[in-house]
UniProtKB/Swiss-Prot annotation:
Any matching Pfam family: Pur_DNA_glyco
Alphabetized Gene3D superfamilies for the sequence: Methylpurine-DNA glycosylase (MPG) (3.10.300.10)
Entry's EC annotation: 3.2.2.-
GO biological process: base-excision repair
Group of enzyme by EC: hydrolase
CDD domains linked to this entry: AAG (cd00540)
Keyword rRNA processing: no
Protein source organism: Clostridium tetani (strain Massachusetts / E88)
InterPro entries, sorted: Formyl_transferase-like_C_sf, MPG, MPG_sf
Listed GO MF terms: alkylbase DNA N-glycosylase activity; DNA binding
Similarity field: Belongs to the DNA glycosylase MPG family.
Protein name: Putative 3-methyladenine DNA glycosylase
Length: 203
């Protein structure tokens, strides 16, 4: 069942944990692609020097961060890789959760082709293990790009997140990745992942 807006109307720190184990879905050319969310990071604009909206920054690029909970914020890093985030809490407060890694569940053949431009039978074991183990990788595998920016994940669109409460797991809290510039914020334990899951980006 698709997650509705009330789920996202909490702090990014809460939602980042709640999203672990949930299922990220995208429909691509009639094929359903699904992956279990196994790693997330929380960003809180007001107090977080790692956030694009730190200090109330409002540029055209970051305005989606101020959107209503349950909408997508998709941006480019290094000019070539997309990152997919979900807006949380309340409209106007710039809180969001970065989806860092997923465990492929359905439509894996299509994911492999999107990632490597060849059939799954022709990719190596290393390539398969790296299919969705990072924010840019999962966006390629699920065909998420800037066209999904500001998309409402709670309506009838092709991109959304489903409930999945069948699995029990431990959550590891750690420092976020790649934000060495963020002064004291680089030490916040705002990265969360499922303990011992092989699909996380790094331990």
């Amino acid at each position: 069942m698709k997650i509705q807006r009330k789920f996202y109307e909490k702090s990014a720190l809460q939602v980042a944990k709640y999203l672990l184990g949930k299922i990220l879905v995208n429909e691509v050319e009639g094929i359903t692609l699904k992956g279990k969310i196994v790693e997330t990071e929380a960003y809180i604009g007001a107090i977080d020097k790692a956030s694009h909206a730190y200090g109330g920054k409002k540029t055209e690029r970051v305005m989606p961060l101020y959107g209503k909970p349950g909408t997508a914020y998709v941006y480019l890093i290094y000019g070539m890789y997309h990152c997919f985030n979900v807006i949380t809490k309340v409209e106007g407060e710039a809180e969001g959760v970065l989806i860092r890694a997923i465990e492929p569940l359905e439509g894996i053949e299509k994911m492999a082709y999107l990632r490597y431009k060849k059939p799954i039978s022709e990719i190596s074991k290393t390539q398969f293990k790296n299919l969705t183990t990072g924010p840019g990788k999962l966006c390629i595998a699920l065909n998420i790009d800037k066209s999904n920016n500001k998309q409402d994940l709670c309506n009838e669109g092709t991109l959304y997140i489903e409930h999945n409460d069948k699995e029990k797991f431990n959550i590891v809290e750690s420092k976020r990745i790649g934000i060495e510039y963020a002064e004291e914020a680089k030490d916040f334990l705002w990265r969360f992942y499922i303990e011992d899951n092989p699909w996380i980006s790094k331990k």
